């Protein structure tokens, strides 16, 4: 609890542990941690969660549709492609991109769709990607935690996603990574 209050203040959020909103947020974070989220290694996801809970953040884009195709080819090659449709303000963007794997294809397609609106995304790099199985007794139906570390110039941040579907967990962490960078850019302009 004290760590959470400290972090919230570090993010310039006015959190009081006796306030009803703050108590609700603390309960929600504990529930997420029970589901497998781990915010100690993903402070960017925690910061976004707190800003959203206090009504100080709205997503910069809305996912309308995402389709991922992985094709195993005759020559042992594997091709991954993501087709994405997002909405930014009132404008819908529909695009596709390939990648070294399905998560890389999703990352490439998302940035391709958003870079026109948010050029700062050209500088963003995913520098690390880690997957951890949360309950090994469930085999391929086990929930996984995905941690993504991203960089942009001298800045570095980490985000997290959890799901029984590795693509969904990766999507959650990827979206947080993009939104975090865009939030930081917006805060720079406001300050």
Q: What is the predicted role of each segment?
A:
Residues 1-191:
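Terminal or standalone catalytic/regulatory effector modules within metabolic enzymes
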């Amino acid at each position: 609890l004290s760590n959470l209050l400290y972090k919230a203040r570090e993010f310039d959020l006015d959190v009081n542990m006796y306030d009803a909103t703050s108590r609700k947020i603390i309960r929600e974070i504990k529930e997420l941690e029970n589901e497998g989220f781990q915010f100690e290694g993903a402070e960017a996801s925690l910061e976004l969660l707190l800003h959203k809970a206090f009504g100080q953040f709205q997503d910069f884009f809305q996912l309308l549709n995402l389709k991922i195709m992985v094709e195993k080819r005759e020559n042992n090659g594997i091709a991954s492609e993501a087709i994405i449709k997002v909405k930014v303000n009132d404008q819908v963007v529909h695009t596709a991109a390939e990648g070294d794997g399905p998560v890389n294809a999703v990352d490439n397609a998302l940035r391709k769709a958003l870079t026109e609106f948010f050029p700062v995304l050209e500088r963003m790099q995913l520098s690390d990607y880690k997957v951890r199985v949360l309950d090994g007794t469930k085999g391929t139906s086990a929930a996984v935690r995905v941690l993504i570390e991203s960089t942009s110039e001298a800045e570095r941040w980490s985000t997290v996603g959890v799901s029984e579907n590795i693509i969904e967990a990766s999507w959650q962490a990827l979206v947080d990574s993009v939104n975090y960078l865009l939030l930081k850019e917006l805060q720079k302009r406001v300050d």
